[in-house]
Structure formats: structure tokens, C-alpha cells
């Protein structure tokens, strides 16, 4: 009997020693959506899919304007692509603080404060980290109260508000329904009430607008008053992510998404009749006069399926380049896929893929192909076709899409486009042309 008791005691002790300790760290805080607190789960081995509807912990842009979306210990860079561990880019977050989540983040825009301008700030519990060009600044991390006196710990969101959007260079902090405007020069804090806004779980400034994320939706707001104008909230996956299919939408919903999406274009072209076709992910937008149409690429170009690298129009046909293949469709209703295609890009145009953009200008038979900063010409009437380098683009490191029309060459980079009178002007230009917004000036989005 005593032997059995002794064995039982040994077994109990071994189990208690083997059992992992419970993680007692609590990041919940009052006022967060979802009850008593908003829990940040650890996802170290998780495969996160932002198209399934993720509530992000923080959103910010880097010094090159690329959005960073944080969830748990993961980070999404840009509008598409897989998540990666945050400590791959910001290793010190783990060195100084076991990284379970980032509470809030923003990139400082304050030209009057060179010590802070273009720095990225990350907030974890009661600490703040300052990075410049992905390197942790000396003496960081610091207590939030030391850098931003009067601002509470365990924040929900933060966003910069530079002049003239705010009267002075300011940072707006969110915690539950409490809003704090922090003046970067005087260190003064003004508490405000944004009655028409939901509680933000993330916030960021993008293309001159201010966005509050709540769940997988967002609202555009006035940084001074918190007023939300227009039809909000909207679905974040429609405007800030490249997601093929989710939910049910009307025809108008599809058109508005493609008009107003902040995700960069993959390709754009204008046919012989002057109609514009813009391609993004799994969808395309066509503009005929003042009429818009949107659908999936697969619905009208089923052999292509989705995601093109570049498209150009020539002699009543679309030449659609994807990886190292060329698909050709005769323009019409419906568009007709030509037999024998796809063919290798090398055989058709004499260049290896991938390419960034391609276009033919009116009444010409030369296709201009952009790859990196190089631009090549191919005479489409020549047999065999020969690739000739025309020049080097010096004003941009990379181009997302380009087309040529009555107004000259349109170059698309991210959410902006630039017009040049001709290819030669683009190659020789010393002064940057006016920067215009794709969603508004090109596609007529009203928000």
C-alpha cells in the first residue's frame, strides 16, 4: 500500500513539473471593442490569411510608403502577399520585449523635427520603439510616458497628422473611445471626442487621407473633428487588400471597389477605340466613355485566369503577358482567345519575363517594354522580331503599369500616375511631371 502511495506521489510531482506554466500576461484594456478587452493572440506558427477577414493590431507605412499591417507576431507588407514574422524585419522587438503583438504604430511626418521625421514608432504595452530605415534608434525602447508625456499605455492605435492637415505637427492616439492629440513641438496633449467614429483598432494616413480600422472594416475620418463623411464603414478587403472572392456584391459594389481601391494596378491599356482596361489581381475595370464595367479576369479572359504582368493593345488585339507567356485575344464582345496561344514571351517579343509594363502608342507598330529601369523596343511588323534597348528611365526605380494614348504616355506607380508627351520626353525628363491619383483623377472615385 505504501509503495502505491509513493508511486502516486512521484507521478503527481513529475506531471506538475512537466506542465507548462500558464501565460499570465494580460494585454486587455478597458474600452476596446469586443467586451472587457481586445485580446492579441500569438500566432508564431500560424498561417494567416488576410482575405478571411482579419482585425489588425496596427497599421503604418514605411519611409517608402509601403503599408505594414500587424497581426499578433506577424506582419503583412503591402496589399498582397503572405505574412511574415515581425521580428524578421524588426528583430529588436523580440530582443527587448517578447513580441506578442504591436499595439499601435505610425510613421512620423514632421519636417520641422529632423530627429523624428520619417521615423517609424511602434508601441508595445508601456514601451515605444523608434526605427529609422529599419534600424532601432539609440537608447530605444523607452517608456511611452518619457517620449509622449500624457499619453497612456496599452494603446489601440496611433496616426501622424502633419501640417496643414492639423494646425501643428501632431500625433493622434486612440485608446477605446478616448482620443489624444499630441503636439510634437509643445508636447501638449488635447483630449478630444470623436462621436461619429467607432473605436479604432488601427489607424493610418495614406494618400493624404485618414483611415480608422475596426474589425475588417474601415472608415475615412477628419483628423481634427473625427467626422466621417460618405458611405462608411467599408470592407477593408475591397480597398486595401488583393482578395479574389468574398461576400456578395452588387454590380455597383464591384465598380466602386475597382475605381477606389488603393491596391496598385498590375496592368493598364487603351484599345484602338480609346477604351481603357485596368487589371488588378483577379479583377479588371473597363471604361468606355463615361460608362464603367468591372468583372473577374476569368469571366472574360478565362485562359488567363488572373493576375497579369502587363497588357498592350495592337491591331485590334490584346497582348497579355503573364510570367514568361503571352496570351492574345481579339477585342470584341466577347473577347476571342487566339488559337496557338499562350506562346513563350521569348518567342513572341524576344525578351525573358517577367516584365513590368508594355504599351504601343497610336498609329505605331512598336511595342515599348519596361523591365526595371530599362525600356526596350520591338517592331511588331518585323520578321523576325528583334529586341532593341531604347534607353533607361531615371526618374523611377520601378513602374507598375503604363499605357499610351492621345495624351501621351501614362506611367502608373503605386496609387499615382504621371503623364509624358512621348516616350522620348519620359526618357529625357529632368523635372518630375505632376503627380496625380489613380483612384480619383484616372478612375473618377469620389472618396
UniProtKB/Swiss-Prot annotation:
Cellular-component GO terms for this entry: collagen-containing extracellular matrix; extracellular space
User: Span of the secretion signal?
Assistant: 1-18
Sequence segments annotated as region (Disordered):
20-44
Alphabetically, the GO molecular function entries are:
heme transmembrane transporter activity; metal ion binding
- Please give the chief subcellular localization of this protein: secreted
Q: Glycosylation: which residues?
A: 87, 168, 199
- Cited InterPro entries: Heme_transport/Cell_adhesion, Hemopexin, Hemopexin-like_dom, Hemopexin-like_dom_sf, Hemopexin-like_repeat
Give one GO biological process term.
Answer: intracellular iron ion homeostasis
Basic and acidic residues: which segments have biased composition?
Answer: 22-44
Q: Where are the Hemopexin repeats?
A: 53-93, 99-151, 152-197, 198-243, 262-304, 305-351, 352-395, 396-441
Could you list this entry's UniProt keywords, alphabetically sorted. Answer: Glycoprotein, Heme, Iron, Metal-binding, Repeat, Secreted, Signal, Transport
SUPFAM superfamilies listed in its UniProt record: Hemopexin-like domain
Report the locations given in the UniProt record: Secreted
| The keyword Signal is annotated on this UniProt entry | yes
Please tell me where heme binds in this chain. Answer: 293
Protein family membership: Belongs to the hemopexin family.
- Relate the protein's function as given in its record: Binds heme and transports it to the liver for breakdown and iron recovery, after which the free hemopexin returns to the circulation.
List the protein's name: Hemopexin
Q: Which organism is it from?
A: Danio rerio
Q: Which gene encodes it?
A: hpx
Amino acid at each position: 500500500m505504501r509503495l502505491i502511495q509513493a508511486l502516486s506521489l512521484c507521478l503527481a510531482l513529475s506531471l506538475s513539473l512537466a506542465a507548462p506554466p500558464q501565460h499570465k500576461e494580460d494585454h486587455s484594456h478597458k474600452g476596446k471593442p469586443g467586451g472587457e478587452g481586445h485580446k492579441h493572440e500569438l500566432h508564431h506558427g500560424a498561417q494567416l490569411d488576410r482575405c478571411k477577414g482579419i482585425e489588425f493590431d496596427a497599421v503604418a507605412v514605411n519611409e517608402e510608403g509601403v503599408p505594414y499591417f500587424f497581426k499578433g507576431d506577424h506582419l503583412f507588407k503591402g496589399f498582397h502577399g503572405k505574412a511574415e514574422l515581425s521580428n524578421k524585419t524588426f528583430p529588436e522587438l523580440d530582443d527587448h520585449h517578447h513580441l506578442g503583438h504591436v499595439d499601435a504604430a505610425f510613421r512620423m511626418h514632421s519636417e520641422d523635427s529632423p530627429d523624428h521625421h520619417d521615423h517609424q514608432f511602434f508601441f508595445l504595452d508601456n514601451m515605444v520603439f523608434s526605427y529609422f530605415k529599419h534600424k532601432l534608434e539609440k537608447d530605444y525602447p523607452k517608456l511611452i510616458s518619457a517620449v509622449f508625456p500624457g499619453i497612456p499605455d496599452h494603446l489601440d492605435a496611433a496616426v501622424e497628422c502633419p501640417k496643414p492637415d492639423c494646425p501643428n505637427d501632431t500625433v493622434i492616439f486612440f485608446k477605446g473611445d478616448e482620443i489624444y492629440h499630441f503636439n510634437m513641438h509643445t508636447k501638449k496633449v488635447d483630449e478630444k471626442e470623436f462621436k461619429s467614429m467607432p473605436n479604432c483598432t488601427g489607424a493610418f494616413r495614406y494618400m493624404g487621407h485618414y483611415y480608422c480600422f475596426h474589425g475588417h472594416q474601415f472608415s475615412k475620418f477628419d483628423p481634427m473633428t473625427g467626422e466621417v463623411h460618405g458611405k462608411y464603414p467599408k470592407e477593408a478587403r475591397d480597398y486595401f487588400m488583393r482578395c479574389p472572392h468574398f461576400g456578395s456584391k452588387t454590380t455597383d459594389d464591384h465598380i466602386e471597389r475597382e475605381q477606389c481601391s488603393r491596391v496598385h494596378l498590375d496592368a493598364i491599356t487603351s484599345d484602338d477605340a480609346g477604351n481603357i482596361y485596368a487589371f488588378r489581381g483577379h479583377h479588371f475595370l473597363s471604361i468606355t466613355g463615361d460608362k464603367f464595367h468591372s468583372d473577374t479576369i476569368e469571366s472574360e479572359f478565362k485562359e488567363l485566369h488572373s493576375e497579369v504582368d502587363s497588357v498592350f493593345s495592337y491591331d485590334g488585339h490584346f497582348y497579355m503577358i503573364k510570367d514568361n507567356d503571352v496570351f492574345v485575344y481579339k477585342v470584341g464582345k466577347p473577347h476571342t482567345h487566339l488559337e496557338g496561344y499562350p506562346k513563350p514571351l521569348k518567342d513572341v517579343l524576344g525578351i525573358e519575363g517577367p516584365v513590368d509594363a508594355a504599351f504601343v502608342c497610336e498609329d505605331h507598330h512598336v511595342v515599348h517594354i519596361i523591365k526595371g529601369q530599362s525600356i526596350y523596343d520591338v517592331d511588331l511588323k518585323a520578321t523576325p522580331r528583334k529586341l532593341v534597348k531604347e534607353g533607361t528611365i531615371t526618374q523611377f526605380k520601378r513602374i507598375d503599369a503604363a499605357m499610351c494614348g492621345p495624351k501621351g504616355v501614362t506611367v502608373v506607380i503605386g496609387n499615382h500616375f504621371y503623364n509624358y508627351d512621348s516616350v522620348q520626353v519620359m526618357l529625357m525628363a529632368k523635372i518630375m511631371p505632376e503627380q496625380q491619383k489613380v483612384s480619383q483623377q484616372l478612375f473618377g472615385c469620389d472618396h
